[in-house]
Amino acid sequence: MKIIQLTDTHLVEPGARLYGMDPCDRVRQLVTHICEHQADADLLVITGDIANDGNLDAYRQLREVLSPLPMPCRLLLGNHDRRDTFLEAFPESPVDENGFVQSVQDLENPSLRLLFLDSQAPGVIGGIYCADRLRWLHTRLQERSDVPVVVFLHHPPVPHGMRHFKHIGFHDGESVMTLLRAHPGGVRHIIFGHIHVPLSGVTSDGIPFSAGRGSNHQFIPGFDDPTPFWTSAPLNYSIITLNEEGVFVHGYDMIECEGIVRARNCLGP
């Protein structure tokens, strides 16, 4: 299975700009590139902060921008989003029995369960995963206890070393990780956004994770700086491949450049 990840698109109302950039135009360029070069993907996931302030017109604008995509989309919520206006613009988005925007998708080859989590809470920058959501996650893990999972969400439930996010990370992340660690089928990968910079790593107990780069703006990495600078970034998305050999995450930066010399076909030894 091939999945495209976008994250932290931060769309604003039509005609507005954010940090001097047009978030909608940037997503439109990404969609055009994905249609031209990744049309064989099975799914596109946006891992939260879809709109910068939960504006209904921003969500409606995104719906129009995404319409050329040949693959289905799963849209997840981040702290900048609003669940009510998002669902008004995307009423077909799957929700759980309590109205949270979270769902599962089961794969046969490879045998995996994809979990899409909702860590948004009104008025809170950090992630919240309340008792109702924890019960939902526990049930989804128990339903197929022998099947490994890949988890998508906005807030990182793992340490990432960015001081700016020390107090606005995933407040209930350890509760989520406790359930995931106990899953007999194991956790193949956790994929998130929120921190706006590309990141990959593995927890001390062996769970791999990665973050995508924000599609509109990112930080100039200053890991110990509580007030790092925002900057523009190359248009980018992540290409996630799930197969019997594992989980592979490739960052694709749309940097305009010309080929110099074509590499030869290296057949070994």
Task: Annotate each language-model stretch with its function.
Residues 16-22, 92, 162-169, 225-227:
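Short glycine-enriched, charge-decorated loop/helix-capping segments at active-site entrances
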Residues 2-13, 111-121, 150-152, 207-213, ...:
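Active-site-proximal beta-strand elements of phosphoester/diester hydrolases
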Residues 21, 28, 179, 199-269:
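Binuclear metal-dependent phosphoesterase catalytic core
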Residues 56-143, 172-186, 205, 227-241, ...:
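Extended active-site neighborhood of metal-dependent phosphoesterases/phosphodiesterases
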Residues 12-15, 52-57, 79-87, 122-125, ...:
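Active-site environment of divalent metal-dependent phosphoester hydrolases
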Residues 1-61:
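N-terminal active-site segment of His-dependent metallophosphoesterases
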Residues 5-7, 42-49, 73-79, 118, ...:
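Active-site neighborhood of phospho(di)ester-bond hydrolases with catalytic His/Asp-centered motifs
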Residues 30-43, 127-208, 239, 247-248, ...:
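His/acidic metal-ligating clusters that form di-metal
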